[in-house]
A protein has these predicted regions:
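Short S/T/G/P-rich N-terminal loop/turn motif that feeds into the first structured element of a domain
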Residues: 1-54, 59-70, 93-99
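C-terminal structural segments of small proteins and small subunits
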Residues: 65-68, 72-90
Length: 99
């Protein structure tokens, strides 16, 4: 079953965050991560959901998720992301309606 990650960001350094995107995008492509959403103008439905950016990612399964975040090149890119932004993320399993 697919594993999803929802992340919201407060971006403190836009140039730094752009460097992260430039480094991370080829890794997402190489590892076949599906990016369902990447919105830099999200509309919060409640005050605690305010964010400069939101992202929704899909991984084949939990193993794919764990493997992706353990890639050395992604770990290095994530250091740049973390220096440029504050992230809050949640991992969860895809829900499938019973038939």
């Amino acid at each position: 079953m697919s594993t999803l990650v929802f992340a919201k960001f407060t971006i403190n350094d836009h140039a730094g965050y752009s460097r992260y995107v430039k480094l991370a995008t080829p890794i997402f492509l190489r590892e076949k991560v599906i990016v369902h959403a990447s919105d830099e103008e999200p509309q919060a439905l409640s005050p605690y959901m305010q964010a400069d950016k939101v992202v929704l990612l899909e991984f084949r399964d939990h193993s794919h998720f764990k493997n992706f975040f353990s890639q050395t090149d992604y770990i290095e890119a994530a250091k740049i992301r973390d220096a440029a932004s504050t992230i809050s993320a949640t991992v969860f399993e895809r829900f499938e309606m019973p038939k």
